[in-house]
Amino acid sequence: MTKAIRVRYAPSPTGLLHIGNARTALFNYLYARHYGGTFIIRIEDTDRKRHVEDGERSQLENLRWLGIDWDESPETHENYRQSERLDMYQKYVNELLDKGLAYKSYVTEEELAAERERQEAAGETPRYINEYLGMSEEEKAAYIAEREAAGIIPTVRLAVNETGVYKWTDIVKGEIEFEGGNIGGDWVIQKKDGYPTYNFAVVIDDHLMEISHVIRGDDHIANTPKQLMVYEALGWEAPEFGHMTLIINSETGKKLSKRDTNTLQFIEDYRKKGYLPEAVFNFIALLGWNPGGEHEIFSRQELIELFDEKRLSKSPAAFDQKKLDWMNNEYIKNADFDTIFALAKPYLEEAGRLTDKAEKLVELYKPQMKSVDEIVPLTDLFFADFPELTDAEREVMAGETVPTVLTAFKEKLEAMSDADFVTENIFPQIKAVQKETGIKGKNLFMPIRIAVSGEMHGPELPDTIYLLGREKSIQHIENMLNQIQ
């Protein structure tokens, strides 16, 4: 590429970092790093009604947690928040007004709503009808004077070229074209409060920041022709555009919605649950992009090297929670113990389970964790009440040799001293029961496991018995014998 690559992620500080926005940031980051370009963070805070206190800090903090870094941002550069650039926007509003390419509009919200209602009732596509249509210059001046005398504050609208055609070659979707007559009429570029609208401000920002490529979600496709109109009106060259497909819920096939409370959708949620940032980064990178091949686990550097915008998918990206859980489990299994133990400690401490056996518990359950917060329910066996048996477990415990196995193993545990009661000495006791009773395989191990833990599956049986403790293991076996005899 001969053009200097400059891309941006431009969030509105209206809440937490959604996984869709995180994907936008991540793909722009990969694009910049792959081509040796510049990645910029710009804060689009012109929608004051939706502004959330601390929203900007939350966005940046969660991006950092993911491992996304940037070259330019409000932290290092002046006027990288739209609210700091109002004079700049005003300059270009004035330029368009002076050229006759924009005009002040005094139509009220009530009048717009009434006209929209009339159009819908008539089966027409709602659009703005120029309020000055058919007026002479004298009538226009009188209309403006009357409106201003009534205290009506105008907006500024861009005069749309209804016969114009606005097209671009999309990086993801190929050729896209809109006719000027289908945009909805002249549209507002400056609101009554003096703030620019999104589609105007973003053009000024992207041009002045020399953005070369705009990579964003395909919900912005309808915004692009309006932005191209502003580029045209100001005589500027537009950047290249790429619109990523929407993210759908793999279970419902519907667009991932923030209202879907059954799906974790905010990066903050994954942080709190103990997902590893490397796993979440890896997972998001594969939402709508495929490097080819069957391999799915990639380091950040591998993703940077492999990234190719030509492999961005035209089909919706499926958000599969089970796949993310699998991927996170792979990262947890391969992470060093100290990292996982440090992450697990706060969960254990909050649950009152940070005992002298905590390290052994984390070591035992590390391979099973889909998220680090699962260390608490996984260790219920050692701290909570004995669980109610399932029908399958009851069926096992109804076997005729079960009392023999449990009685023999209980006697072995009772004969062990506290000093002898260590993990490596427990398995030989089980083998001794096998030798004495002639009972082996599942008929030997399964009754002991269920009697001790209340579960058919779990960590290695000697580890489970050791962590439960000799006295508690004996007590559980006695309780089970009382139930089945």
Curated annotation (Swiss-Prot):
Keyword Nucleotide-binding: yes
Binding-site positions, ATP: K258
Record keywords, A-Z: Aminoacyl-tRNA synthetase, ATP-binding, Cytoplasm, Ligase, Nucleotide-binding, Protein biosynthesis
Catalytic activity: tRNA(Glu) + L-glutamate + ATP = L-glutamyl-tRNA(Glu) + AMP + diphosphate
GO molecular function: ATP binding; glutamate-tRNA ligase activity; tRNA binding; zinc ion binding
Source organism: Streptococcus sanguinis (strain SK36)
First and last residue of the signal peptide: none
Subunit structure: Monomer.
GO biological process terms on file: glutamyl-tRNA aminoacylation
Motif 'KMSKS' region: where in chain: 255-259
Main location: cytoplasm
Motif ('HIGH' region): 11-21
Function in brief: Catalyzes the attachment of glutamate to tRNA(Glu) in a two-step reaction: glutamate is first activated by ATP to form Glu-AMP and then transferred to the acceptor end of tRNA(Glu).
Protein name (record): Glutamate--tRNA ligase
Gene Ontology cellular component annotations, sorted alphabetically: cytosol
NCBIfam families reported in the protein's UniProt record: gltX_bact
Gene: gltX
Localisation per UniProt entry: Cytoplasm
Similarity remark: Belongs to the class-I aminoacyl-tRNA synthetase family. Glutamate--tRNA ligase type 1 subfamily.
EC number of the protein: 6.1.1.17
Transmembrane found in the keyword field: no
